[in-house]
């Protein structure tokens, strides 16, 4: 069932973050109903016919302050997906026999990086993702139930995520709905993409769903940049240093450049340089970006869009760099736009240093 048609019941453990979580779920297309943990019964939830149940964050201890939350987990296991956030995860931990105790530190609105298993909520989420924490309690490793597996941890070993090995039940200790959490929207999308009561059942359903080309490119570019961002001399800090040293070429305003053509009674043409596409295959595998850019500039175009994605479009960031150099001496040169599947600040910084005046952002890829 598509995320847009998922009916979600959220149990509110009297926490203000419940409504941030509500907003994220709604933004991803879910229909969400929220009920306080002492103001609804299991039969009433059954009557609502939810596709997913979410257990919210909350103050206190899951054993004493979570109301109906643990009963909800017990009742709906093996029937529909159940996801928990912060106290919601602690409820999962305790319901299956684990202990939630003092975590050894108190954190309130602080970020930590976590490593994860790239499954469930963490599918396609980069490693060392920064997440926001508000807690002093956590599930203990020594009491981890045999039926649960750890999905994420901080650098100092605190459990940040658990998943049931059989049932579609998963939780995280941090807050994906916090603005400081990286890839929070992707995590929420992943929640809503789960169906059925068992992971095995869900895996079969997921296998039947055809992955979109955008999803394929997105996943591949994440892998590409995990490598690229760790190359010596190409790390984020390196690019920031280059920018501070004034190594980025001067830029022109994209909108002003379009307006120049329009004000002069000309068509503001946005031209494009690409060697291939997913739909057309190879268009011109030998296309020279510098030569093509100069031809476009001489023809009076307002903007030159340069595809820099290597796998499906056969481009690269060097294409943009040489295209910019080729037109720098042209009077009233066109604007250079990087057309790419952009999902992080590194790619924007990289584009700027290569000579881009602006970049294309695909809203569906942003979180």
Swiss-Prot record:
A Pfam cross-reference name: IGPS
The GO cellular component terms are: cytosol
Q: Give the reactions, separated by semicolons, that this protein catalyses.
A: chorismate + L-glutamine = anthranilate + pyruvate + L-glutamate + H(+); 1-(2-carboxyphenylamino)-1-deoxy-D-ribulose 5-phosphate + H(+) = (1S,2R)-1-C-(indol-3-yl)glycerol 3-phosphate + CO2 + H2O
Which pathway does the database say it acts in? Answer: Amino-acid biosynthesis; L-tryptophan biosynthesis; L-tryptophan from chorismate: step 1/5; Amino-acid biosynthesis; L-tryptophan biosynthesis; L-tryptophan from chorismate: step 4/5
Q: What keywords sit in the KW lines? A: Amino-acid biosynthesis, Aromatic amino acid biosynthesis, Glutamine amidotransferase, Lyase, Multifunctional enzyme, Tryptophan biosynthesis
Identify the PROSITE patterns for this entry: GATASE_TYPE_1, IGPS
Which residues does the Swiss-Prot or TrEMBL record annotate as the active site?
86 (nucleophile), 175 (for gatase activity), 177 (for gatase activity)
Where do the segments described as Indole-3-glycerol phosphate synthase lie?
209-367
GO MF annotations for this entry? anthranilate synthase activity; indole-3-glycerol-phosphate synthase activity
Q: Which GO terms describe its biological process?
A: L-tryptophan biosynthetic process
* Domain Glutamine amidotransferase type-1 span(s) in chain numbering: 7-201
Binding locations of L-glutamine? 58-60, 90, 136-137
> EC number(s) of the enzyme?
4.1.3.27, 4.1.1.48
- Self-association state and partner proteins as the record states: Tetramer of two components I and two components II.
Further remark: Component I catalyzes the formation of anthranilate using ammonia rather than glutamine, whereas component II provides glutamine amidotransferase activity.
This chain belongs to which protein, by name? Multifunctional tryptophan biosynthesis protein
What lineage is this protein's organism placed in? Eukaryota, Fungi, Dikarya, Ascomycota, Saccharomycotina
């Amino acid at each position: 069932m598509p995320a847009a048609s998922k009916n979600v019941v959220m149990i509110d453990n009297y926490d203000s973050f419940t409504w941030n979580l509500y907003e994220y779920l709604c933004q991803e297309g879910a229909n969400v109903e929220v009920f306080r943990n002492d103001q609804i019964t299991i039969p009433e939830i059954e009557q609502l016919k939810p596709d997913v149940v979410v257990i919210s964050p909350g103050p206190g201890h899951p054993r004493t302050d979570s109301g109906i939350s643990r009963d909800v987990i017990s009742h709906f296991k093996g029937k529909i997906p159940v996801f928990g956030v912060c106290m919601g995860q602690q409820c999962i931990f305790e319901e299956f026999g684990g202990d939630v105790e003092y975590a050894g530190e108190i954190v309130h609105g602080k970020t930590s990086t976590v490593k994860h298993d790239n499954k469930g909520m963490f599918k396609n989420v980069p490693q060392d993702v920064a997440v926001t924490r508000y807690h002093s309690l956590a599930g203990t490793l020594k009491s981890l139930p045999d039926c649960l597996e750890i999905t994420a941890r901080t650098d100092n070993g605190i459990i940040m995520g658990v998943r049931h090995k059989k049932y579609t039940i998963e939780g995280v200790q941090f807050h994906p709905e916090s603005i400081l959490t990286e890839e929070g929207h992707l995590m929420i999308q992943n929640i809503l993409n789960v169906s059925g009561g068992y992971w095995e059942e869900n895996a079969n359903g997921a296998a039947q769903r055809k992955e979109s080309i955008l999803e394929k490119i997105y996943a591949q570019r994440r892998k590409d940049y995990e490598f690229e961002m760790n190359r010596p001399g190409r790390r984020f800090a390196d690019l920031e240093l280059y920018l501070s040293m004034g190594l980025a070429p001067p830029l022109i305003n994209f909108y002003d450049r379009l307006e120049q053509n329009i004000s002069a009674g000309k068509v503001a043409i946005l031209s494009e340089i690409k060697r291939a596409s997913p739909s057309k295959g190879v268009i011109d595998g030998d296309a020279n970006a510098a030569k093509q850019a100069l031809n476009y500039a001489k023809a009076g175009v307002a903007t030159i869009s340069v595809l820099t994605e290597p796998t499906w479009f056969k481009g690269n960031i060097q294409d943009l760099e040489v295209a910019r150099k080729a037109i720098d001496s042209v009077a009233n040169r066109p604007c250079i736009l990087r057309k790419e599947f952009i999902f992080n600040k590194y790619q924007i910084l990289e584009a700027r240093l290569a000579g881009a005046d602006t970049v294309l952002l695909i809203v569906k890829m942003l979180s």
